[in-house]
A protein has these predicted regions:
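Short, flexible loop/turn elements at secondary-structure junctions
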Residues: 61-63, 100-102, 123
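Mature extracellular/periplasmic domains of secretome proteins
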Residues: 45-54, 82-89, 109-114
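Structural alpha-beta junctions
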Residues: 21-33, 92, 113-125
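Extracytoplasmic/secreted cell-surface and envelope-processing proteins
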Residues: 13-15, 40-42, 65-76, 105-109, ...
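Active-site-proximal C-terminal subdomain of hydrolase catalytic domains
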Residues: 103-215
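A domain-level signal for caspase-like cysteine endopeptidase catalytic cores
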Residues: 1-60, 95-100, 171, 176-181, ...
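A short, glycine/acidic-enriched catalytic loop
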Residues: 64-92
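Short, solvent-exposed linear motifs at loop/edge-of-secondary-structure regions
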Residues: 88-104
Length: 215
């Protein structure tokens, strides 16, 4: 069984392309949208608690090293923590894929609490210009809004290809998803360097691959 959880938020709208691609390729899954209101947050948590063990859960949204977030409405409902580090046990005995900033650190620090079968997470994923401006290293490298838009497209492209390959072979263990991600990120990095001459995009993709963990 596959469950996709996506936080509804203007800045994560691009991630709905992943949902659309799974649907168009006839991948069966349950979709849980976390809208910017208390009832939707609670509904999501209630549904997670009811999931059978050994489910594959994909979370698409924002995160920090101590939590993942639900939906946000600008000037209306600021994003709230959906699951904090000490609450990660809600994913016990599940296969967890967290496409969210700093989810690698969250997975590492909550490993004993969460007791997931396996979990995949990432480091920083700068998808907004403010995130670049707040990171001196990225700002000094000259990462532009255009680079960020290309990075968002590349995230979707590599994640979609990896998920489709993984889900279409039901005999594969969850750890193979990381192998597919490494493969497609490497291909996209090579394309950025050799065909597009875009070193900044290649660096962002390299960091995404390098910071990815499985626990």
């Amino acid at each position: 069984m596959i469950t996709v959880i996506i936080s509804v938020d203007p800045s994560t709208k691009f991630l709905f392309d992943i949902v659309k691609s799974l649907k168009s390729n006839s991948i069966k899954f349950e979709l849980i949208e976390v809208h910017p209101n208390n009832a939707s947050y609670k509904n999501c948590l209630d549904k997670i608690k009811e999931l059978p063990e050994n489910n594959t859960i994909l979370f698409l949204g924002h995160g920090q090293d101590n939590q993942i977030y639900g939906g946000e409405l600008l000037n209306g409902y600021p994003k709230q923590p959906l699951v904090k580090r000490n609450e990660m046990g809600i994913f016990k005995n599940q296969n967890l894929f967290l496409l969210a900033c700093d989810s690698a650190s969250l997975i590492k620090s909550s490993f004993r609490i969460a007791k997931t079968n396996k979990a995949i997470g990432f480091g920083p994923l700068p998808t907004e210009i403010e995130e670049v401006e707040n990171d001196k290293k990225l700002a000094n490298e000259g990462i532009t809004l255009d680079t960020i838009e290309l990075f968002k497209q590349a995230i979707n492209e590599t994640v979609i290809l990896s998920l489709l390959e993984f889900f279409k072979d039901e005999s594969k263990d969850f750890i193979f998803l990381k192998d597919y991600l490494n493969l497609h990120l490497n291909k996209r990095i090579n394309k950025a360097i050799l065909e597009e001459d875009n070193r900044n995009l290649a660096d962002l993709l390299f960091n995404m691959k390098n910071d990815m963990v499985i626990y």
